[in-house]
Regions:
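N-terminal membrane topogenic signal
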Residues: 5, 25-29
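A short, structure-level motif marking secondary-structure boundaries and short turns
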Residues: 1-3, 53-54
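Short juxtamembrane and helix-loop transition motifs at transmembrane-helix boundaries
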Residues: 13-23, 48, 71-80, 128-130
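Membrane-embedded alpha-helical segments that form the functional core of polytopic membrane enzymes
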Residues: 30-78, 110-117, 155-167
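A feature for the membrane-embedded catalytic helix bundles of lipid/isoprenoid biosynthetic enzymes
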Residues: 2-17, 83-181
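Helix-loop junctions at the membrane-solvent interface of multi-pass transporters
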Residues: 25, 45-49, 102, 150-151
Length: 181
């Protein structure tokens, strides 16, 4: 639900920015790689306990993640979403790993969340490829991770709640995928 609202709000300015970037011959793949690098930097910042810079890096990662899709739409460059989704999943599952590195007492909660996010990402990718859907599903995860960065002592609670939501989302996608059409 949150992602649908965010998409309606953020797509028009992203599409406008994408047209400008396309005019300068900026490719979606370059934006995807930049988003990935920012995501890796956010993971490192979390691991070192720099939570506020991590929130900024995550926000920039999410912004570029949306922008690479907008550039792809503007250029009609075809389905580049698998590369973006794969790199996005590495960042998404790396964030809980960063929290575990920052404080090993969070390792079990981080492992639970990594498993849940990996399952949800796999289900999302497989059903999106089959149905031609896009890969916008990260608004809730961003809010949860930003909250965890602002209140790192609450990471385990955030991890368990987000993990349950991710498992439910994966189950719902799998149920929809096997339902006769």
């Amino acid at each position: 639900m949150l992602d649908a609202v965010l998409k309606r709000t953020i797509d028009p300015p992203l599409d406008a920015a994408a047209k400008r970037l396309v005019a300068f011959n900026i490719k979606a793949d370059a934006i995807t790689v930049a988003a990935f690098v920012l995501g890796l930097a956010a993971i490192a910042a979390i691991a070192w306990g720099y939570y506020l810079p991590a929130v900024v890096l995550l926000a920039l990662n999410r912004l570029l993640d949306g922008l690479d899709g907008a550039v792809t739409r503007a250029t009609g460059a075809g389905p580049r979403a698998v590369v973006a989704a794969t790199l996005g999943t590495v960042v998404l599952t790396g964030i809980p790993f960063g929290f575990a590195l920052a404080d090993p007492s969070r390792a079990i909660a981080a492992a639970f969340l990594i498993c849940a996010l990996a399952g949800a990402s796999a289900a999302r990718i497989s059903t999106a490829v089959r149905n031609g859907a896009d890969f916008v599903e990260s608004g809730v995860a961003f809010v949860a991770f930003a909250f965890a960065c602002l209140l790192p002592d609450r990471f385990s609670l955030v991890a368990y709640v987000l993990g349950v939501l991710a498992f439910v989302a994966a189950g719902a996608r799998l149920a929809a995928a096997v339902r006769p059409t």
